[in-house]
């Protein structure tokens, strides 16, 4: 059943966002193509440019809910690959995707993820994680940087040499410092702004090769 939203109860900014969302080309395309969110096209474009996710690979998707990146990555790795998704939020099941609900910082959850990896190696770590934004960069940016640091720590703990981290970043305070720190552990870091990212968005994606 559709949810009715009364415009009079929305602020001007919320109403503008809702109109932008409904009119968004990628939102409409995602609904048509069966993706859970428009973010799917960001990963599709990134992989078209980098060809990092391939058939038979093992991929871990951090902060996976609602699952659009898992949909894309699961298709890319194919039947012989492994896609492990994890989020503190619930996520509806997807074919050939192993979902582990919980905080990957916790040893129990981390161990469950690695148990699914088994004797394979993690080829790619994905992170489309973002905080619930307050619209205040002084609050939002530190929260985002913290999530980025968590993704980097996970990647360093799991990726072999040559493995890749694909991670969303908000451009702002702390990003250059984090990039400099990562250069000690990653041989190459590339930035991509996919076409599916809204022009006004501060988000970019880093592709880091260990």
Swiss-Prot record:
Residues bound to S-adenosyl-L-methionine: 67, 69, 87, 103, 128
Catalytic site: 168 (proton acceptor)
E.C. designation(s): 2.1.1.166
Localization: Cytoplasm
Any single Gene Ontology cellular-component annotation: cytoplasm
Annotated SUPFAM superfamilies: S-adenosyl-L-methionine-dependent methyltransferases
Record field: catalytic activity: uridine(2552) in 23S rRNA + S-adenosyl-L-methionine = 2'-O-methyluridine(2552) in 23S rRNA + S-adenosyl-L-homocysteine + H(+)
Principal subcellular localisation of the protein: cytoplasm
Xref: InterPro entries: RNA_methyltr_RlmE, RNA_MeTrfase_FtsJ_dom, rRNA-MeTfrase_E, SAM-dependent_MTases_sf
Keywords: Cytoplasm, Methyltransferase, rRNA processing, S-adenosyl-L-methionine, Transferase
Enzyme class, first EC level, given as a word: transferase
Gene3D superfamilies referenced in this protein's UniProt entry, alphabetically: Vaccinia Virus protein VP39
Top-level taxon: Bacteria
One function term, GO molecular function aspect: rRNA (uridine-2'-O-)-methyltransferase activity
Family, per entry: Belongs to the class I-like SAM-binding methyltransferase superfamily. RNA methyltransferase RlmE family.
Database matches in PANTHER family: RIBOSOMAL RNA METHYLTRANSFERASE (PTHR10920), RRNA METHYLTRANSFERASE 2, MITOCHONDRIAL (PTHR10920:SF18)
HAMAP family named among the record's database cross-references: RNA_methyltr_E (MF_01547)
Function: Specifically methylates the uridine in position 2552 of 23S rRNA at the 2'-O position of the ribose in the fully assembled 50S ribosomal subunit.
Name of this chain's protein: Ribosomal RNA large subunit methyltransferase E
Annotated organism of origin: Psychrobacter cryohalolentis (strain ATCC BAA-1226 / DSM 17306 / VKM B-2378 / K5)
């Amino acid at each position: 059943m559709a949810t009715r939203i009364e415009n009079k109860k929305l602020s001007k900014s919320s109403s503008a966002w809702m109109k932008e969302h409904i009119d968004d080309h990628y939102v409409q395309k995602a609904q048509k193509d069966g993706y859970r969110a428009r973010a799917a096209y960001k990963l599709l474009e990134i992989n078209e440019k980098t060809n990092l996710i391939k058939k038979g690979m093992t991929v871990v998707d951090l902060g996976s809910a609602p699952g659009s990146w898992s949909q894309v990555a699961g298709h890319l790795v194919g039947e012989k690959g492994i896609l492990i998704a994890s989020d503190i939020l619930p996520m509806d099941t997807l074919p050939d995707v192993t979902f582990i609900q919980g905080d990957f910082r916790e040893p129990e959850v981390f161990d469950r993820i690695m148990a699914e990896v088994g004797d394979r190696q993690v080829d790619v770590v994905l992170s489309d994680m973002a905080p619930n934004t307050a619209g205040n960069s002084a609050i939002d940016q530190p929260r985002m940087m913290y999530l980025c640091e968590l993704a980097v720590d996970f990647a360093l703990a799991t990726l072999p040499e040559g493995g890749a981290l694909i991670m969303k970043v908000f451009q702002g305070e702390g990003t250059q410092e984090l990039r400099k720190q990562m250069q000690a552990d990653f041989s190459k870091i590339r930035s991509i702004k996919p076409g599916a990212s809204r022009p006004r968005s501060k988000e970019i994606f880093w592709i880091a090769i260990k």
